[in-house]
């Protein structure tokens, strides 16, 4: 909660930021990388992530905390097998028990390596800088199947000869096929993933979306030789995690499925396809199944307790036992660091925070039970890996390699970012206390600014199993007050549907509120955030999904907004634009309904800061404001609350709203957003006052004159620009302190026409620890009325006329409408909006 008077702060971001932060494993050429990176590629977790059986079915080799470990089922002791460089995942154990094949993430690639269990030596089996994953030995141990992006950056299956820890004669088994299907979340290029050998070694089972629009596809079999014809044996919608495995008798297979439910469980079906059924149940994920060689057990990874864990289930029987490494035998000297984070004002009390810990080996470390998170992009010139972090309640203990340890601690935007180094000796405990010093933000007893993130997904098909109480803990670590969990579908399922309620979540506290709203997930008109639905969840929760009963472009977003407003909800456009839309260009296609809905009064806010390009979104926002529409900014991270690889923590993009100084309630906060008493930020804090009016207010003038302003900046990172923007143009560049982290300027600007002004701040490049494209902050407008003249812009009106003409043309030619009445109602709505912009001339 931030308490100070707000004047108007505006933030602008530069394209230069893109040149520095680039996606993790950027060599993969597929759309929507945040999905396949989290759901398919291995991620660093403090708990186990995948396992393989010994031939006698008494031991497992598994990946945990970025290393490979071996553990007997009857023992609580785990033996570390690898310790870098890099992070090691996805082990597979050869039938002769000598070799373990695994995937190592290092040097901006994932390569396959082999581990000789006789002497502990590792050998690199692939090179070239591609992403190579899911290695699987043939039953005789002489061949290795795996998935690689080495051909054009797409996921295909390869097979090579394995001998003495090395691969040779590697060939692509599945050819590249470009589909004409209208896929939204998946590439036009078919993928093939998750290979599994038949027990005689003659064929390979895999998962592919060949011939399918939605999901990662069905199950296919192919002879294990290039040029062979594959055939589909079973189809159901999958989502990167099916990972089938044959029973040792070769007659059955086990895989992970969410068929008819919201969570993955273990399912079995005949090896040649047929009717499947589940063999595990629960409101959590059981994934990565591996059948034991003796056929009596299945090992799998579960997130039933939140973090990942390794389990074994008897088959038949159903008894499940967790495999826990209560004792760990490390390959190198280790010590422990006891970390305590406190508030500088009340040092006797621990406070929640976000923590980055790097060992002397350059790798990331976390407590054994902590959820590890990874940034989805990073600057290669600054670090070899993306930033990894975890949340602490204020007291944590971390096992790290002996030597120097780097510790970074962050607690939202109202405390300074703290960095420390400490030496940890082998077999000893080093104590570290970090005091979080608050920013010197001027406090005004008449103001009360409360932070919130209006775009959060508590569970969204990720690695972990999140709960409302844990989401509150995540918010506390970021010093974030309000969380709007937008319940939404991921393909067929809606993971958090059971939590939807018009009421405040019971996990809320006096300092943190959690509510469950909805994101309406059209694949055409643009996504909507629906805050404070007071009656029901809107179903179906999406539109324009080809080859489904929701293929029609109806309901359009205007219809959805009407339904939401009938429930008293706020409606906002979320993560609007990755680039500035140009209606004069044929491509990319323009389908966003935003300008039409704004003109018709359907939109209560826009995420100027969101999972999009802030500067491009702001340009469109300015044009809408220039047409006389009053549209406040909010901010939403699109935080995937159960992801291990994600675009920043909850509250990365947050909105501050001015509310009365009273006990925390949601109603005044939502009212403040609708009234425009807000500023949005991913770091810099703003204060803006214009003509005596605060953000969301209106300055009324009789004529052109100099108008007084007051602007302040408080930032935990340097920013390059602090500007007042009026009617889309920079009215005043403001000078900051020498560190570029603060400013307090009083002055005047000339105002001679009706319109608006905002204060914005931004940097030209990324600034750690802000895990976003670049630091950016903007206030909502202070509106200006001169002689009562309306706000009009012929040029911007013409821009939106051209935009809506594109929408009308596409809607007329679309053939997916259920009825002519649907089509005509949407066309009529678009035409009505067009006329409003046409009158701007």
Predicted segments, located by residue:
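Short coil/turn segments that connect the beta-strands within blades of beta-propeller domains
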Residues: 56-58, 96-98, 140-142, 200-202, ...
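Beta-strand-rich domain onsets/edges
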Residues: 321-336, 345
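Catalytic cores of extracellular degradative/oxidative enzymes
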Residues: 449-633, 637, 643-644
